[in-house]
Amino acid sequence: EEREVYTEAGFDEKEQAYFHGEKREESFTMEEIGEKENFIGDFGGVLYFYKISGNKKDQKRFYYKDFTGRVNLAKKFGGIKIYRDQFRVRPYGEYGDNDFDWLELSARRNRSPAGLGKENGNWRVGSEQILGTVSISRKNTNLEAAANRNGIQEGIGFSQLKRILLFVISEFERDRQFVGRKLARY
């Protein structure tokens, strides 16, 4: 079944290796991201995407995935959370809170509702399909705590952090849509 999917979808050997967990790393300069200056300094993070559900055709295409229980996973672990020096900065990524979707991924997806395998348009990930952490430190001087100690002060640093994260997410979306378009042929 696996070989059939690869062959009919047109995946080459390198793409098949990627399917089997070969890591792919990308790095970008601030200029490539569209930023003239780095206002926030170094930071790190990890983002994960997960498909919440799948119809019978999706289950055949994504034969290596189990979709059961994923909605509950989104409620428990979903969202992109921020940590400063290993301490959680609330409310970012808090399920059920207005700041769960602090990058406004759902609104962005609604403006571009293309399906993953569609040849036209740009597929966008939803806030319930992505989880992860962003790690900052007290050295990130332009990412100051808000006056009420709940969140980060809106300003040049926080705006830049959001733009950088959206750039990274859009690169992921482009890669994911490439795979989705190939699988749509199957």
What residue ranges belong to the model's regions?
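Charged regulatory segments coupled to nucleotide-binding catalytic modules in large multidomain enzymes
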Residues: 6-10, 15, 20-186
